């Protein structure tokens, strides 16, 4: 069972490490040192729910419903374009709000709402958890499938907390106008690239 658990850890890490809306949001909250551990926890718990749904049967629903898959794709493209546009606006703005009073006025509930949108409207989350993990998990027996799911959840929890803590630790170097412009420009380009790739895949 440990081999199955390790397989889940490695596969979960491989899918969660690339930059996406979730990672970008956790990183930015870590840099601001604003509810970053709460955000990491909520992202990890959301992933746990999605992983469980995908591995224990939810993948069949998404694979069999072309209408649902199309709705997820269209919503995901729109969200990624909007997320990328916001990052680009920040990258090219004359005055970037760092850890100022205006930034800190964001309420806890607004941050939670943004985190939920970043997670649950991210099409790659469903692709990873429902299609990839669901397909692989279905190959295991019930006991082994639980260990596989636990391994992927371990990777998720470890990564989000490590990212939040590392970003908070590096905040003095990352929370500068120049670095923030570079980070937001890179995030915006990646989000638009993912949106284009997803739109082309959905069109096909």
Swiss-Prot record:
Its main location: membrane. One of its GO terms (molecular function) is L-arginine transmembrane transporter activity. It is a multi-pass membrane protein. The lineage of its organism: Bacteria, Pseudomonadati, Pseudomonadota, Gammaproteobacteria, Enterobacterales. It is found in: Cell inner membrane. Belongs to the LysE/ArgO transporter (TC 2.A.75) family. Involved in the export of arginine. Important to control the intracellular level of arginine and the correct balance between arginine and lysine. This is Arginine exporter protein ArgO.
């Amino acid at each position: 069972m440990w081999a199955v658990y390790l397989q889940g850890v490695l596969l979960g890490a491989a899918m969660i490490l690339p930059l996406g809306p979730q990672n970008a949001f956790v990183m930015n909250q870590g840099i601001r040192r604003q509810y970053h551990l709460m955000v990491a926890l909520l992202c990890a718990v959301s992933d746990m729910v999605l992983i469980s749904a995908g591995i224990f049967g939810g993948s069949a629903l998404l694979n069999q419903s072309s209408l649902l898959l199309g709705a997820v794709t269209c919503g995901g493209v729109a969200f990624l374009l909007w997320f990328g546009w916001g990052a680009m606006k920040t990258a090219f703005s004359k005055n970037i709000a760092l850890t100022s009073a205006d930034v800190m006025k964001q309420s806890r509930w607004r941050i939670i709402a943004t985190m939920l949108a970043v997670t649950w409207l991210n099409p790659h989350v469903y692709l990873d958890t429902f299609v990839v993990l669901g397909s692989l998990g279905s190959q295991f027996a019930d006991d082994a499938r639980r260990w596989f799911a636990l391994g992927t959840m371990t990777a998720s929890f470890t990564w989000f907390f490590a990212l939040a803590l590392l970003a908070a630790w590096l905040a003095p170097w990352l929370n500068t106008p120049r670095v923030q412009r570079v980070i937001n420009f890179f995030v915006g380009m990646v989000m638009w690239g993912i949106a284009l790739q997803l739109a082309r895949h959905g069109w096909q």
